[in-house]
């Protein structure tokens, strides 16, 4: 009986520590999701503003080109649809999100479109991406328990953006800006989806469908 009473404080402390870790994990997930939602909204606004400066024919032509082209981050292996996203583990979704955010660290500093919103927010976007990357890395460390490291991720090395856009021709600047903004919007939507699903899984909610 005495041994049981001695074990009770240890079990209580362990329970409190576990609850504290779970609460901290949820707090980090909430911050990460809120930040990527803000980035996604900013990306959508910048893309819409840039489209508004184009003539209708230009907009249609660029949209056709973009649908046939690829984003630089497409080399990062990620779920192809909602079903695959829901089947992916929390750790896998976090790793993909980390790589996607990482892929925008340099391009976010080199966007030089003639758009007042972008000029005002370029530094802010870079800072938010950097903060989000740190936050996702903390979530990965809290989720992996030594199972997988970032170096073990099967994502390929991203090609440099300079090479990606070097052969765009005379209208390359407009096309480059359009593709960068469209890809940024697309990738922030991906990260928002992945982090939202991962957060839901960690909260043990009954329904995490997209």
Curated annotation (Swiss-Prot):
InterPro entries: 4_helix_cytokine-like_core, Somatotropin, Somatotropin/Prolactin, Somatotropin_CS
Family statement drawn from the similarity comment of this UniProt entry: Belongs to the somatotropin/prolactin family.
Main location: secreted
Amino acids binding Zn(2+): 38, 192
One annotated Gene Ontology cellular component of this protein: extracellular space
Chain ranges passing through the membrane: none
Keyword entries, A-Z: Disulfide bond, Hormone, Metal-binding, Secreted, Signal, Zinc
An annotated GO BP: animal organ development
Secretion signal, residue range per the UniProt entry: 1-22
Protein name (database record): Somatotropin
Cystines in this chain: 71-183, 200-208
Gene: gh
Function: Growth hormone plays an important role in growth control and is involved in the regulation of several anabolic processes. Implicated as an osmoregulatory substance important for seawater adaptation.
GO molecular function: growth hormone activity; growth hormone receptor binding; metal ion binding
Species the sequence originates in: Salmo salar (Atlantic salmon)
Subcellular location(s) per record: Secreted
